[in-house]
Amino acid sequence: VANGQGITLGTLALVDGTGLASNYSLNSASLNITERVLNSSGSKTYDANTNALAGAITLSNLVSGEALNHSGTATISSANAGSYTITNLAGITIADGSGGTASNYTLTGGTHNFTVNRRVVGVSGTRLYDATTNAVASDLSTHTNLVGTETLNLSGTGTIASKNVGSNKTVSVGTLALADGSNGGLAANYTLSGGTHQLTVNQRPLNATLSRQYDGTTTSAGSDLSSFDALQGGETLFLSGTGTVTNKNVSSGQSVTLGTLALDATGATALVSNYSLNSASLNIIQRPISTVYLTKLYDASTTVQASDLQTMSNLVGSETLTLTG
């Protein structure tokens, strides 16, 4: 850059215009070299501020083979995701670079564009096995890579490849969608595209109810199973092994010490690995006396007395009972 530099005329010559060149002579010439106007462009990921750092900006319109260094911070008009013109370049300083002299260039008057890209969000969470491949928004409560204290809301349903229990299963986005949250969190500044989305499916705990007739023991066998409280999707399971209760007598809802009681999928439609046995309770119901034999001498009456008892069947072990009335 210079003003009024003398020019060695070389082959410079006058030619006819509206006048005749022969009426004039070229005595001298001078050249003003002005600064070359630089353009700039850049981008960053949304970070909730209006800074455009030099490291995110690329200079253009340099003379071929020349390069410049630049440093500092420019400003854009909004922190939100979108395309902007840099409004304040005063904070950017250009310096000599490889083959390039800073004084030959200026940022003033150029075209300066800057893009703020959406920030990629990851979502993850945990739920109990439910016999589906759904990953609903309410199960994906952890949102990562948000700026500062910003929060977002999530709606919709994604999917996982397998319904079965497992850790960190990849979630396909499906209809999952971000919505504005709190502390300045705007959905338009974020995207699920390209994020890491994971769901852990844990075993669903089952509580078993067992029922049997009084048998004089405190044993509760898997074959006494009456029902489970939380099987999913119409699935079936059974029990094997034995547990114990503290009271052998007729009762309802006695807590069972599980012992060797275990979930058993033999002949069932469910996988044992998708469930855990949390607890069991036992209902002991009265044992019916199937036959009572009474004998009496003919006495011309239709009365049968308890004292006529001879035997009872279906009693447990050596237990005995008497009749009255």
What are the residue ranges of the model-derived segments?
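Short loop/turn motifs that initiate or flank beta-strands
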Residues: V1-G325
